[in-house]
Amino acid sequence: NTGHEIITQGTMTPNYMEYEKMLATENVDHIRINSKSTTSLGVMLEARYVSAFYHPKYGMFATLSGFWNFISFEQPEEAFRVVTGKDIHEQVARCRANGNKQVKFADNADFRRLIKETVIYKILGNSKIFEQLSESVLPFRLYYYKNQQDEFVDKSAKEKWLFDIYEDVRKLAQGKITLQQLLH
């Protein structure tokens, strides 16, 4: 499954055609960060991709998404250390149903610093991601199509701050900056 699914309505809607247009340029003018990307780098950079890492303050996590959710709840749930894939969404729903409040702080500088640290730990801990980053030059995009709603979702502008982190780690992988420069 590459993400190039045929829509069930059998109709080429404008939203679906926009999605197909983006897919046609994947790995030509951008790397799509998505579990269905045609590039292994795009798959590995997706937040739910299993690539265990250790954060010195928070410990071990299987995925970036698990860490992200762990730090976003007022009462951190240990399950986020190991839960993967779509089970992460189910764990989030359970936490909310149990009254555990989720803090919305994606624009918070401390949150973004923590995510930057975590992305660095994830990539430095996975030689395959690091190597592929060193060999890549294309910019990153994040988009998908919701078939049931006939909705093309492009989160690239919203996630630019995260792509900037990937770009900085890519500079490290390509020898353009030092680890010390990356951390500051």
Pin down the residues of each PLM region:
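Charged, low-complexity intrinsically disordered segments
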Residues: 2-184
